[in-house]
Amino acid sequence: MTTEHEVRRLDRVIIRFAGDSGDGMQLTGDRFTAQTASFGNDLSTLPNFPAEIRAPAGTLPGVSSFQLHFADHDILTPGDAPNVLVAMNPAALKANIGDVPRGGEIIVNTDEFAKRAMAKVGYATSPLEDGSLDGYRVHPVPLTTLTIEALKGFGLARKEAERSKNMFALGLLSWMYHRPTEGTEAFLRRKFAKKPQIAAANVAAFRAGWNFGETTEDFAVSYEVAPATRAFPTGTYRNISGNLALAYGLIAAGRQAGLPLFLGSYPITPASDILHELSRHKNFGVRTFQAEDEIAGIGAALGAAFGGSLAVTTTSGPGVALKSETVGLAVSLELPLLVVDIQRGGPSTGLPTKTEQADLLQAMYGRNGEAPVPIVAPKTPADCFDAALEAARIALTYRTPVMLLSDGYLANGSEPWRIPDLEELPDLRVQFASGPNHTLDDGTEVFWPYKRDPRTLARPWAVPGTPGLEHRIG
């Protein structure tokens, strides 16, 4: 039977999904975000995953989380203190409870709170029974058991059925916050199109979570957060991550400049998504080159710039150190080159999945000799699109390498982005040198590769192979 529930209206909510790396927290958060975006809320996300390579299950280092802040008004950050924590095991609870304010809601998967699992993270007694959670609104839910029960008729092994518990949790939260569900069900059918049994099981688990919220008396209240209609100017919107926005911005810059876009890059977290995305867009004149190392990546990009392409290389802090000599060469050659640094945490190799904004001084001064470089830094995930266009404008106009400093939070975080009209994009067209630009005293016409434009002080950009413009630079 359906239980009558109170519906409370809120202006904003912060939800954090937390569990083991294999519990599907990133997918759960991503789908809840997609539902929230389609509903029309303003939002900001913060994915957070371990720096270790698949830490042991049930341990504190292995906890993965996804935080979403959504509201009926304009918001700028993913927030600090989650109002709701979904903890899939004791490790997730212990790692995140310190961030939840008193009075916050905690949904706990009680099936995972066995003595051994609790001892693994230092719980001598069960936090669900010893009073340590008395200041919170705790909802003990046997997510694993309920999921297995809901999937009994699908002929799945127990382990296969257990994997859908994140979809049960997603269904429950979707009911709690009145999220639209059609998009998630369609996504699951697409994702598992080659495994229709698994697709149907995940949809069933998702619906079971929704129905559990609708029928149980433990959840007496559901919540509504109205669309943020006043936060968005008129236009077409989509949810976008920083790296995706940056990739789209680079493609747009190439099209607006009338130049082929070339990316020379070595895969490195958290910048690799840009390489992956750009490799899908050959139809827009994009060429990607996965190099054997950081130096080869920027070397290829600099060669492409010399050849008349809009050239880009992507990396993170350790890679910037390796690329510094070639950046200095680009300065002396006066060639346009975009160096995208998606900053991560720590010195040396650092922590690939953690974030930091500590590369500014390296970007400003990390080269020998006098080699100044302009720096552009986006402020939000959506702003990465405009930052890419601005970096390209500076590089092309003034014939200089430009550093674009993003970071792991911006790269993986997301927010609504208004898709711009083509008329709103800047004109980045460049004029290549096509003939002599100086006349000697004896009347001979010659090409001077470092003759300055009186307005921009940039040198002419002569593409190799142009008759009569043979020259040496550097």
Located regions from the model:
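Non-catalytic terminal/interface segments that mediate subunit docking, oligomerization
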Residues: 17, 27, 227-302, 306-314, ...
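Flexible, low-complexity linker and terminal segments
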Residues: 239-249, 257, 387, 392-474
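Active-site cofactor/cluster-binding pocket
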Residues: 1-257
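Thiamine diphosphate
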Residues: 12-101, 261, 269-365, 374-395
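Acidic, Ser/Thr-rich peripheral helices and adjacent loops at domain boundaries
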Residues: 117-133, 356-364, 421-438
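Glycine-rich, charge-decorated loop segments at or immediately adjacent to ligand/cofactor-binding or catalytic sites
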Residues: 116-122, 150, 324, 347-353, ...
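A glycine-rich phosphate-binding loop feature that marks nucleotide/adenosyl-phosphate handling sites
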Residues: 49-50, 188, 205, 226-230, ...
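Conserved anion/nucleotide-ligand pocket segment
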Residues: 159-166, 170-178, 382-385, 393-407
